[in-house]
Amino acid sequence: MSWLKEVIGTEKAVIAMCHLRALPGDPGFDTRKGMNWVIDRAHDDLMALQNGGVDAVMFSNEFSLPYLTKVRPETTAAMARIIGQLMSEIRVPFGVNVLWDPVASFDLAMATDAKFIREIFTGAYASDFGVWDTNVGETIRHQHRIGADHVKTLFNIVPEAAVYLGNRDVCSIAKSTVFNNNPDALCVSGLTAGARTDSAILKRVKETVPDTVVLANTGVCLENVEEQLCIADGCVTATTFKKDGVFANFVDQARVAKFMEKVRHIRQ
């Protein structure tokens, strides 16, 4: 039995993303609508996800485009306000993801009592937003300093919109990441949000680290969820839950319910 059963309540868990709209400081933030509009939209998406039957949710500043690797304090503060206002209505285990700043994610997790975080913890990459370096040693020491050792860590080892600077195979990355960092899960992704995770790569990673939870991190949909969950221990899902399966849209509860009905059948 993996920690998914203990923390989320089931194996083959579906972690649904609650994508927060652009926040103060982001280029896309609408100062006329303000934070109350952002909170209301997050509330609507959260309700649709929960009522549709997902196992867990993860809040992320998905519309803070283009992303920073060291976020400014207003981003974390805005996310804390949103989650704080929604707290009384959160009925499932939840995590947080401050894109792309693992230190900020740990800080937010401690402020909100989140159970897990997802981040790019390791590696060096050429990305859409420049050369992207990490410092996992400092990040995990920060986790320990603030008393966040209980927060589960989901290591994204195939970052979206980025490639590893070194010529390393994904399986060697998976193996060394597990050996050096003891992550709670590895996330395997496609190129962007909503892009399908390659099942062959997913299978190779799981075979390389069979004792570590491996999650399909992008592109899981009604048509491929059975194939993906036959390999992975669970999935992180977002775009397929939105109206017409379009990234920019809001969550469609009917799509969520149909997806989760199929997942329940797969689990049997």
Give, region by region, the residue ranges found by the protein language model.
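Active-site mouth loops of central-metabolism enzymes
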Residues: 19-44, 94-101, 155-171, 216-222
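Hydrophobic faces of well-ordered beta-strands that scaffold small-molecule active sites
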Residues: 14-18, 57-59, 94-96, 117-119, ...
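Alpha-helix-loop-beta-strand connector modules within alpha/beta enzyme cores
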Residues: 10-11, 16-17, 68-96, 134-153, ...
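Glycine-rich, proline-tolerant flexible connector loops at the mouths of alpha/beta enzymes
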Residues: 53-78, 124-128, 183-196, 243-246
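Catalytic cores of alpha/beta
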Residues: 96, 101-114, 172-174, 205-210, ...
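N-terminal amphipathic alpha-helix/helix-capping segment at the start of soluble metabolic enzymes
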Residues: 1-35, 140, 144-145
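Alpha/beta catalytic cores of nucleotide-metabolism and tRNA/nucleoside-modifying enzymes
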Residues: 141-142, 161, 221-226, 230-268
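Conserved anion-binding
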Residues: 20-26, 104, 108-184
